[in-house]
């Protein structure tokens, strides 16, 4: 059994950022300061193994920024795997975290919890992209379980007063073998890859270009938050290639980040 940890805190004082990081194998941080700081979250094991229990915590202070990247897809190996991620974003902070796709292999039992707390003036771009299995090997829907829970709290009230957290978004997927209903038209149909891009907080309104994979339009749906406390958009996309979904999400976020920098002339 492996207990991996990856903790990262960034605070900003004027033009300078203070970064505190800690990692415990097999999780590793690899990065350097910049504008914004860019860190890779690495796992030299080539994926998550049965018995793994990983904890990821990211905290950004007021005005701080961070971009997190991965080096490739995350493969889920046979056995029970647990992972918890906690994110806390202070006013006017910005986090971009678009991981590569997650690939659940035969016999994998993956259970994930993602908890996010953000100020309405912060900006979060976060994605989850999944496949039905090791598609290149002809393996589909052979994993035991894929359970992922996402909860987002928004700080409500005046910053000078005692602020309370409002549960703003809650989503949960729980797919279990033999996955009898996943391929129905109301769920995924014939598609073997799917993903969600969450753009929460003070982003410019996004533009979603039409995506074609192998000459076929990749279906997508856009959900806009009606909540006046915190704005947000969620893009759902399905298709035959998880890498294409990941690239599309990354392009959208890059365009938004560039527009944000232009409008604010830097943080």
From Swiss-Prot:
InterPro entries (alphabetical): UreD
Keyword Cytoplasm in record: yes
A Pfam family hit: UreD
GO CC annotations on file: cytoplasm
Protein's UniProt keywords contain Cytoplasm: yes
Record's keyword terms, sorted: Chaperone, Cytoplasm, Nickel insertion
Main location: cytoplasm
Gene Ontology MF, one: nickel cation binding
Location(s), subcellular: Cytoplasm
Source species, domain of life: Bacteria
Subunit structure: UreD, UreF and UreG form a complex that acts as a GTP-hydrolysis-dependent molecular chaperone, activating the urease apoprotein by helping to assemble the nickel containing metallocenter of UreC. The UreE protein probably delivers the nickel.
Function: Required for maturation of urease via the functional incorporation of the urease nickel metallocenter.
Family of this protein: Belongs to the UreD family.
HAMAP family named among the record's database cross-references: UreD
PANTHER family (UniProt xref): UREASE ACCESSORY PROTEIN D
Name under which the protein is recorded: Urease accessory protein UreD 2
